[in-house]
């Protein structure tokens, strides 16, 4: 945009303001990711999009905006997990984001058909899958809840035999200043290319809601956070960051403080039976020092039950 040569000219100022790109919910699709391309195809079929001009020197291969102005759809040539700083790159390309949704594949050894949602971060020093050590991305609990609930509703409506579940915090990117989440199809090439699953994921993304809900940070359980998932579906709450039992040894005050701040958490939840007594005591003490209460499942259901 050219600078306003006459700052006293209201008409010129109004023109500049109107040309300032507005942050949008931004869906990121990766070229080498089969599930991402499946979801992209469904998104393009479901609603009308217009192609956007992007700078030649940007790292994006294409960008579109929905006709209603709510979403942008941006193509990248790389994998999602190594996209630290993506928010700044989007802004520099004139595509600022208010929320980043990574449309992605999910891979598991069990090869379970699944639709999953999670936020990103590295509780330990392991950064093989992107991000920085002991760093968490800003989560979007309301968006995660709405997408997961809609995935479940649509999958049941279609009779799809897919597990719909919340995953714990894992992998990159971590260095993003705007909220983000992953919406995924798993867990093999068969599911990644399944158009029915792609349609469910795409429709759920387009139905995303940012209406505030009570938020917990979670501790314990396995990778698929089964008890947290049940609470998300069966009560009015959502979860921000979740740390599974096999990562609790790395959880310290600095990480918990990050999780609270980057989830805007109202309380904490323990999957108690999965946690060692010393882990519960350690984390309880940290939470007490930080002023965050721990609610039991029965208390959550009583206070926030649907």
From Swiss-Prot:
Which Pfam families is this protein grouped with?
tRNA_deacylase (PF04414)
Describe its assembly: Monomer.
Q: What is its EC number?
A: 3.1.1.96
**NCBIfam families from the entry?**
PRK03995.1-5
> Which GO terms fall under biological process for this protein?
D-amino acid catabolic process
Residue stretches in coiled coil:
none
Q: What is the name listed in the Swiss-Prot or TrEMBL entry for this protein?
A: D-aminoacyl-tRNA deacylase
Q: Which GO terms describe its molecular function?
A: D-aminoacyl-tRNA deacylase activity; zinc ion binding
Q: Which gene encodes it?
A: dtdA
EC primary class: hydrolase
Entry similarity comment: Belongs to the DtdA deacylase family.
> What's in the keyword line of the UniProt record?
Hydrolase, Metal-binding, Zinc
Annotated HAMAP family: Deacylase_DtdA
List the catalysed reactions: a D-aminoacyl-tRNA + H2O = a tRNA + a D-alpha-amino acid + H(+); glycyl-tRNA(Ala) + H2O = tRNA(Ala) + glycine + H(+)
Q: What does this protein do?
A: D-aminoacyl-tRNA deacylase with broad substrate specificity. By recycling D-aminoacyl-tRNA to D-amino acids and free tRNA molecules, this enzyme counteracts the toxicity associated with the formation of D-aminoacyl-tRNA entities in vivo.
Q: Which InterPro entries match?
A: Deacylase_DtdA_archaea, DtdA
Q: Which cofactors must be present for this protein to function?
A: Zn(2+)
Task: State the free-text cofactor note.
Answer: Binds 2 Zn(2+) ions per subunit.
């Amino acid at each position: 945009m050219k600078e306003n040569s006459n700052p006293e000219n209201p008409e010129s100022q109004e023109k500049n303001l109107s040309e300032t790109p507005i942050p949008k919910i931004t869906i990121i699709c990766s070229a080498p990711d089969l599930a991402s391309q499946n979801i992209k195809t469904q998104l393009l079929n479901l609603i009308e999009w217009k192609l956007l001009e992007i700078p030649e020197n940007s790292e994006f291969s294409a960008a579109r905006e929905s006709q209603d102005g709510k979403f942008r759809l941006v193509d990248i040539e790389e994998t999602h997990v190594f996209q630290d700083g993506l928010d700044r790159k989007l802004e520099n390309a004139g595509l600022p984001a208010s929320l980043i949704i990574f449309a992605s594949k999910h891979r598991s050894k069990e090869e379970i058909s699944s639709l999953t949602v999670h936020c990103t971060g590295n509780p330990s020093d392991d950064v093989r899958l992107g991000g920085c050590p002991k760093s968490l991305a800003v989560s979007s609990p309301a968006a995660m809840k709405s997408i997961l609930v809609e995935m479940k509703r649509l999958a049941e409506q279609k009779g799809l035999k897919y597990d719909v579940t919340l995953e714990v915090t894992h992998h990159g990117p971590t260095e993003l200043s705007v909220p983000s989440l992953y919406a995924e199809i798993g867990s093999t090439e068969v599911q990644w290319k399944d158009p029915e699953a792609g349609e469910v994921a795409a429709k759920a993304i387009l139905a995303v809601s940012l209406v505030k809900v009570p938020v917990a940070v979670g501790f314990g359980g396995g990778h698929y956070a089964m008890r947290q998932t049940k609470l998300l579906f069966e009560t009015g709450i959502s979860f921000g960051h979740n740390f599974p039992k096999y990562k609790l040894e790395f959880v310290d005050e600095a990480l918990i403080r990050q999780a609270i701040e980057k989830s805007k958490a109202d309380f904490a939840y323990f999957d108690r039976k999965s946690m060692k007594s010393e882990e519960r005591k350690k984390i309880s003490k940290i939470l007490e020092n930080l002023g965050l209460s721990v609610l039991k499942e029965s208390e959550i259901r009583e206070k926030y039950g649907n």
